Design a protein with these regions (language model features):
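N-terminal "mature-domain start" segment
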Residues: 31-68
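Sec-exported extracytoplasmic/periplasmic mature domains
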Residues: 48-53, 89, 93, 99-106, ...
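Stable alpha-helical elements in mature extracytoplasmic
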Residues: 39, 43, 47, 90-98, ...
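Extracellularly exposed regions in secreted/surface proteins, prominently low-complexity, repeat-rich
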Residues: 17-18, 30, 35-41, 127-175
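Secretory targeting and sorting signals
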Residues: 1-31
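A short acidic-to-branched-hydrophobic micro-motif
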Residues: 78-98, 153-158
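Short Gly/Thr-rich strand-loop-strand
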Residues: 62, 102-145, 171
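Exposed beta-strand-loop-beta-strand "reactive/processing" segments of non-cytosolic proteins
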Residues: 67-77
Length: 175
């Protein structure tokens, strides 16, 4: 009987230790600095084609950000090498972050626009503005930075080259 008692005691200890390990890992994975899961999921619904929570990571939020996601290389080999997405609590905060995010870029025209700098963009065939878009380069990489005003989302994609027109075309197709 003592062998059975020892075996039961060892099994109980193993189960308890495993439960504590699972509990500790769940607590460690929950990071309050990345916002709540509802906001992260809302933001994830606004990612460019090919990106999702399977290849983007929640980042610590600051100020008026509700959620932030950083993504690496697009699954599309012609796509960006990096993307970042931010969800804000208000349109004013979105506009301020947009202005701040483009201030160090060398701005160029976007596509067939004649404007160097921020310009309105339209989603699909819509005639109403969806937000602002800016195209340019920063530290030897092309960048497209845009807002989706109705959703308070700021988005950013970056290429490994300075080919702004190619990145802009990718964005128009997949953005």
């Amino acid at each position: 009987m003592s062998h059975l008692a020892d075996a039961l005691r060892a099994a109980t200890t193993a189960v308890l230790m495993g439960s504590f390990a699972c509990l500790a890992s769940t607590t460690a994975a929950a990071d309050p600095n990345t916002g709540n899961s509802s906001d992260v999921n809302t933001l994830a619904g606004n990612l460019s084609k090919g990106y999702g929570l399977n290849n983007c990571t929640a980042q610590p939020i600051t100020g008026s950000q509700l959620a932030a996601l950083t993504c690496g290389q697009s699954p599309d080999p012609n796509g960006p090498v990096q993307a970042k997405y931010f969800l804000f609590s208000s349109g004013d905060d979105l506009a301020n972050w947009f202005k701040t995010s483009i201030k160090d870029d060398v701005l160029t025209t976007c596509g067939d626009s004649s404007t160097k700098g921020p310009a309105p963009w339209h989603q699909g065939n819509a005639t109403t503005n969806a937000g602002q878009v800016a195209c340019g380069t920063y530290q030897d990489g092309a960048e497209i930075i845009w807002t989706t005003d109705a959703k308070n989302v700021l988005s950013y994609i970056r290429a490994s080259t300075t080919d702004v027109p190619a990145l802009y075309q990718w964005w128009r197709t997949n953005g």
